[in-house]
Amino acid sequence: MRVKETVRELHPCFGQARNKGRIHLPVCPACNIECNFCDRKRNTYENRPGVTGAILSPEEAVDALKKALELCPEITVAGIAGPGDTLASDGAIKTFQLIKEHYPDLLKCMSTNGLLLKERADELIELGIDTLTVTVNAVDPKIQAKIISGIYYHGKRYEGEEAAKILIENQLEGIRRIAAAGITVKVNTVLIMEINRYHIKEIAKAVREAGATMYNIIPLIPQHKLKACKEPECKDIDGARCE
């Protein structure tokens, strides 16, 4: 499946839209996965994934979007990526419903860990999400179990390979459903040299077969339980991408 022409023209992350802008709206407070590399915080001095200065309500987010568009009319994409997971609460869905109502021409871009993607795919399809990014760090439960400590799924906490199997199954089936609806799907993988460096090819193959259009490898920021791991260098990322 190819990237839609509209997405290519208007989304700076998916094509040649270098003069277009995007805004990320922090409306998701909760997360349902304990990633060993994630240290979520609320402050105004760190600039990394998992950190935000505040959590907005859907109404506050749309108000912020309105002000941003007044200052920067080049914005063509409204994105929601956290700071928690976008499907672990209803903040993202409600925000996109308001954006669809008030700013129907904006692209709606969402990121998720994919744990609830299989069961909430129909909501996203009905909502008219334009692009979806799913973080898939392994498709082998033994490897995934080294990356996450556990998941919270339907009111119960799962650990180890049991948690990993649930996550992987839901991610891949969710991608299949979203891609089958014609939505552009990108997959991100956090490159962890000590854990999934030689697993990249298998991940890429699995997500491609599920329907993902783009595959992106991003470097680990060593922190939290993986703070002793090596930070990947450019040559490491290039090597993984060439496999």
Feature-to-residue mapping (PLM):
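A short acidic, helix-capping loop that chelates divalent metal ions and anchors anionic groups
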Residues: 45-48, 142-145, 155-157, 223-228
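Short Fe-S-cluster ligation motifs
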Residues: 60-81
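Canonical Radical SAM [4Fe-4S] cluster-binding loop centered on the CxxxCxxC motif
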Residues: 11-57
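Conserved beta-strand segments that form the floor/walls of ligand-binding pockets within enzyme
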Residues: 26, 79-81, 186, 190
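Conserved AdoMet/S-adenosylmethionine-binding subsite of the radical SAM
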Residues: 87-218
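Auxiliary Fe-S-binding modules of radical SAM enzymes
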Residues: 1-19, 201-243
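Short glycine-enriched, charge-decorated loop/helix-capping segments at active-site entrances
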Residues: 48-55, 148-151, 160-161, 229-233
